[in-house]
C-alpha cells in the first residue's frame, strides 16, 4: 500500500529570483533523501509561490525496503587459531557489524576461504522516517540568508509555518522554533489561514484562499490572460520569458490588466520606455500588429479583478513618473558636449588601484590600433574605430544613464548620432558592451567587435596586473564574462589572431599609468574560457588542443571538433599513438633541432625527414588532421627500423631532431601525446 506525502514551508516574501531555484532544489533533495532511506515512490511534484515552498510525493512506499548486505572479513587462517577458535580479528570484525561469531560463515574465493557475515535490516514504517525531513529543509542553500528572533541558524527568510502530512496524518515536527501543523496561509489580502486536509487536497485547499500553488498553472493563467487582452484590443504583447518567470514569482493569484500612458512619451527613445516598463516596473510591452510601440503596458496584479480600475490608475501614475524622468534626461542630455564629458571621465574612477575611466579609454585606444591591423580593417573602419575609442564611455556621465544604467552604450549610440558622428562610430559605442552574458548577442560590425575586444582585454589585463584575479566562484569584476566575450567575438569573426602573440604585443606597450604583469596567469585564464567553449568535448582532446602551439581561437575550436569527429574511426587510435610516440621522444631533443642528412643510416630516416620537411598544414582542420594521420605509416616504419636513442650522440640528436621538427609542426594542431587511446 502506498501513501502520499506533503511538505510545505511557509515563509516571508522571497526574492523572485530565488523562488524557482529553491523549489527545484527542494524537489531534488527530497528525492535524494527518500532514495537514501530506501523509500520508493512514483512521482514528486514541487510547488512554490513568493511565500511558500512545497513538495508532494505520490505513490510513496509505506515502509522501507528490507536490506540484506554481505560483508567479507579476514581469511579463515587468520580468523581461526590453532585450536579452531575465533581469533580477536574475527571477533572484532563481526562486532563492528553488530553481529556475533555465530553469524560467521566461510566462503571460498580463488582457492582460499574467507569470513563472511550477512546482515539483514528490516525496513521501518514510513512514519518513522518522516521526521528526517527536517534535515532536508535545513540542507537547502540560498544565495543570501538571514537570521532572526535570536536564531543562530540562517535561512533565506523567516519561517512562519510548516506543514507535513502523510495522507491525512499530521506531523508536528519542529523547525526553527516553528511547530508543524496542517495550518497554511492563504493570500496575504484575499485569503485566510486554512487547514490542509490531506496531501492530495493541497492545491484545492489553497485555491479557496486565492493561492495558486503550482507555478506552471500561474504561468499559464498569466499567458492566457495576456492572450485575451491581445485578442480584445488587437495588439501584440511581448511575453519575455525572463520577465514572465519573474512576475509569476511575485504573485500568488495573478490577474493581468492593460494600462496606458500619454502618447507624447513615445517621442523618447523606445529603449528608454521599454527599460522603464520592463526593468523597473515589471510591465510587458505592447505593440501594434506592425511592431510599433504603443502607449500601453501589461501588468500582473497579485490578486483578483476587484477594484481593478484603481489598481490600473495606480500603476499608470507610477509609470508616468518614470517616463517623466526619461523625457527630462533625454531633453537635457542633448545639451551636453561629448568632448566635455570625455574630459570629465578623468575624475571618474575605473578602480582605485588602476586609475580613471579616461586612462582605461586611452589604453583601450592604443590596443585598438594594434587590433585594427590584425583584423585587417579598412582605412574608413580604422578611422571610425579611432574616433569611437576616443569617446566611447562618455554616456556614463549623462543623466539618462545615471538614472537607467541598463542603457549605457545604447544612449551613447543615440547621442553620438545626434551630435553628427558616423553610424559606424555610434554602433561601435553600443556594441562594445557585447556580449553582456555568456550567450548574449555579439557585435555585428567589425569596428564594434574590435572596440569590444580592446575594452575587455584592457579590463582583464589591468585587474590581473594589480592582483585582482578571480578565484573559485568569486569574480566581482566579471573578468570571466569579459574573457568569454573576447573568445566568442574572435571565433564569430573568424579572425586569425593568435592570443599568445597578441598578449605579447600588449605587454610590449608601455603605458604610463599601468604596467601589465602576470602574463602566464592571463594566458591560463583565457585558455580556461576556450576550454569552456569546447563544451562536451572529451577532456583529453581539450587538453591536447590547449597544449598546442596554435592559439588562434577559431583554429583551436575547429581542431577539437575535428578530433572528436574522427575519434571513432578505425585509423584514429594507431595514428594518434604514432604521433604520441613522436611527441614523447621529441622532448629528449637538445638545443636547436637541425637535421643533417649525412647522418642518416636507413631509408626510413630519410623518408620521415623528407615527409616532415614538405609538411605544410593547410586548409580546414579536418584536412590538416588527414595530413598528419597520413604520416602514421612513415612514422611507424621509422620506429620499426631505427633505434632513436642510438649510442652515437650525433646520430641520436639527429633522429630526435627529425621528431622535434615533426612535433613542432603537429603541435600547431594539437599535442597528440595528451590524447588517451586506451
UniProtKB/Swiss-Prot annotation:
Top EC class for this record: ligase
- Please verify whether the record's keywords include Chaperone: no
State its Enzyme Commission number(s). Answer: 6.1.1.14
Q: Which GO terms describe its molecular function?
A: arginine-tRNA ligase activity; ATP binding; glycine-tRNA ligase activity
Q: Where in the cell is it found?
A: Cytoplasm
Q: Which GO terms describe its cellular component?
A: cytosol
Where does the source fall among the domains of life?
Answer: Bacteria
Record key words, sorted = Aminoacyl-tRNA synthetase, ATP-binding, Cytoplasm, Ligase, Nucleotide-binding, Protein biosynthesis
GO biological process terms held by the UniProt record: arginyl-tRNA aminoacylation; glycyl-tRNA aminoacylation
Q: Which coarse location class applies to the principal site listed for this UniProt protein?
A: cytoplasm
So what does this thing catalyse? Answer: tRNA(Gly) + glycine + ATP = glycyl-tRNA(Gly) + AMP + diphosphate
Instruction: State whether it acts alone or in a complex, and with which partners, per the record.
Output: Tetramer of two alpha and two beta subunits.
The record's similarity note reads:
Belongs to the class-II aminoacyl-tRNA synthetase family.
**What is this protein identified as?**
Glycine--tRNA ligase beta subunit
Source gene?
glyS
